[in-house]
Amino acid sequence: MNDYVQALLMILLTVVLYYFAKRLQQKYPNPFLNPALIASLGIIFVLLIFGISYNGYMKGGSWINHILNATVVCLAYPLYKNREKIKDNVSIIFASVLTGVMLNFMLVFLTLKAFGYSKDVIVTLLPRSITAAVGIEVSHELGGTDTMTVLFIITTGLIGSILGSMLLRFGRFESSIAKGLTYGNASHAFGTAKALEMDIESGAFSSIGMILTAVISSVLIPVLIILFY
C-alpha cells in the first residue's frame, strides 16, 4: 500500500474512532467510557485484526502528533482569560503543585525501593505524571526506558481522567482552582482535556498545574537520583 494512502487511512481511523467514542460517552455518561481509552482500544483492535504494525500506524499517527503539538498553543487562551485570578493565587498554585509532585515521588520511589527495584526501573516510573514531551527526555537522560515511560505516562493520564471526577466528588472539591490543579498535576494533558470539559477556569488552572509539574519534576528527579544513587 502506498505510504500516503496508509497515512491517510490511519488518520481517518483515529478521527472516526475518537468521534464515535466521544458520541458514546455523551449518550452514556460514564467515566469509564473515556473517549481516549475507547478510541485507543479500538485502534489496537483494528491494527491486530489487519496485521498493521506500530510503524505502519505511525505513518498517519505522526501527523496527528504534529497537529496536537501545535494545538497546545490554544491552552494560552484560558490562561490569558483567567490571568487575574492566577496572579492572585500564585503562592497557592506553586505550593499545591510542589506538594503533589513530592507526594508522587515519595509514593513511586519508596514503593519501588521497598520491593528492591533497580535505579533503571525507578527512573522509568518517576516521570509518569509529567507530560510526555518532558517525561520521555527526563527518563532517557537518566538511563530509564523511555518507551516504558511513555506507557506509564499514558496509563497515568487515562486513570486520572477516568477516576478524577469521582475522587473530586468524594473529596467535595468545588473550587475550580482545586479541580484544575488536581487534574493537571496528576494526569497532565489527559487531565487538562477533562478539566476543559468542566469549565474554562478549571482548564486554565489544569494547564498551569501540568506545566509547573513538568518544570518542577524535571529539576527534582535528577536531584533525587543523584542523592540516592
From Swiss-Prot:
One of its GO terms (biological process) is killing of cells of another organism. InterPro entries: CidB/LrgB (IPR007300). The keyword Lyase does not apply. GO terms for cellular component: plasma membrane. It holds the Pfam family LrgB. Signal peptide: none annotated. Disulfide bonds: none annotated. It comes from the Bacteria. The chain crosses the membrane at residues 4-21, 30-52, 62-80, 89-111, 147-169, 204-226. Its main location: membrane. It is found in: Cell membrane. The keyword Lipid metabolism does not apply. Belongs to the CidB/LrgB family. CidB subfamily. Increases the activity of extracellular murein hydrolases possibly by mediating their export via hole formation. Inhibited by the antiholin-like proteins LrgAB. In an unstressed cell, the LrgAB products probably inhibit the function of the CidAB proteins. When a cell is stressed by the addition of antibiotics or by other factors in the environment, the CidAB proteins possibly oligomerize within the bacterial cell membrane, creating lesions that disrupt the proton motive force, which in turn results in loss of cell viability. This is Holin-like protein CidB. It comes from Staphylococcus aureus (strain MRSA252).
